Design a protein with these regions (language model features):
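P-loop NTPase motor module signature
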Residues: 1-4, 8-159
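A short, hydrophobic C-terminal helix/tail in secreted or cell-surface proteins
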Residues: 158-167
């Protein structure tokens, strides 16, 4: 949903990070289907050893490590209009470095939109972190969604396979 909201009024690429390669590919496929475009055209992805995006792509999904690597040759991430860091609660080293980098980049790129998403993140803490230094706290936007029922099973409910007496 956030990706589609960002397409309006954009003047550059939307970069969306995912913590895992499979997630980046899967989400890219889904977004391309939702928009009605072939994967690799308007919506692309890049993971280690695989780049299915074009210069004309509007949305690029990638692992957080790929975006972090891009900062080495494009310090201001100039081709991006919006950066979405998804699953920020994963708190990997790459995500933590990326969030720190984006915080220091924002004063130099006030036009850059940064969106951090998570189902379980401490909203107030991140809002204060991205504000601070004389700036107001970053805005918090809550997007409600579907919740899925969770069934809890214990080992008692799972039948144990028959084991041979000797191996």
């Amino acid at each position: 949903r956030q990706r589609q909201m960002c397409i309006r009024d954009m003047h550059g690429l939307i970069g969306l990070t995912q913590p895992r390669r499979l997630a980046a590919r899967s989400v890219a496929t889904r977004v391309a289907e939702e928009i009605g475009t072939p994967l690799g055209e308007l919506v692309g992805y890049q993971v280690r050893f695989e780049d299915q995006s074009k210069d004309s792509s509007l949305i690029k999904l990638m692992t957080d490590g790929i975006l972090l690597a891009e900062t080495q040759h494009d310090r201001y991430l100039e081709k991006y209009d919006t950066i979405i860091v998804d699953e920020a609660h994963e708190r990997s080293l790459n995500i933590d470095f990326l969030l720190g980098y984006l915080k220091t980049l924002l004063p130099r790129r006030p036009d850059l939109k940064v969106i951090i998403t998570s189902a379980t993140i401490d909203l107030e803490r991140f809002s204060k972190h991205f504000g601070g230094d004389g700036l107001p706290d970053a805005p918090i936007v809550e997007v409600s969604g579907r919740t899925y029922p969770v069934e809890t099973l214990s080992l008692i409910h799972i039948s144990e396979p028959t084991r041979p007496e000797r191996i």
